[in-house]
Design a protein with these regions (language model features):
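Phosphate-binding and adjacent anionic-ligand microenvironments
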Residues: 15-167
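Cysteine protease catalytic core and zymogen-processing segment of caspase-like enzymes
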Residues: 1-14
């Protein structure tokens, strides 16, 4: 999945590209993206869901790589658009250079930077007013602990994203 491949691209290309351009991710992307990027001294910008937000920023600024959970990955040195063929070539090149199975590399990345975790819940509402009321209610009633994990942060960029403490 992209939750595995975007971290792979950042890790692999970060080893061979000599730049410090930032990484773009949508709010729905796993925080392993942030962990890898920060290990390479890259800023990470978290954007609303949708590749259009990534493309807009790629057009305006020098960007290393940007991706979203649905599979869209854009490479800053190529073009500000999703390109599956280019991504496949980068992936195959990396596999050939490392001379190991992809799952082994992905396991190493998760050992070094934490697990890739993704859980998304989409809820349809009959109108915007009801949606806003439910969102406000949830925000006002978020517990300090979730399943015995301390709440670390709340993102309201595009919906509600809860980050819990790893420990």
């Amino acid at each position: 999945s992209t939750q595995d491949l975007l971290p792979y691209f950042i890790s692999y290309l970060g080893e061979i590209k000599n730049n410090s351009y930032p990484v773009l991710k949508t709010v729905s992307g796993s925080d392993i993206i942030k962990n890898i990027s920060e290990s390479q001294n890259r800023d990470v910008f978290e954007l609303p869901v949708g590749f259009k937000y990534i493309a807009e920023k790629m057009i305006k600024e020098k960007i290393f790589i940007g991706g979203e959970e649905s599979g869209g990955v854009g490479f800053g040195d190529f073009m500000p658009e999703r390109d599956a063929l280019y991504a496949a070539m980068v992936l195959l090149n990396g596999i050939a250079e490392k001379s190991q199975y992809l799952y082994e590399t992905l396991d190493e990345i998760q050992e070094d930077f934490g697990p890739s975790f993704y859980k998304r819940i989409d809820i349809k509402f009959p109108n915007q007013s009801e949606k806003n009321n439910v969102k406000e209610f949830i925000i006002d009633n978020i517990p300090e602990n979730i399943n015995n994990h301390k709440l670390k942060s709340i993102s309201k960029i595009d919906g509600i994203k809860l980050r819990i403490d790893k420990n």
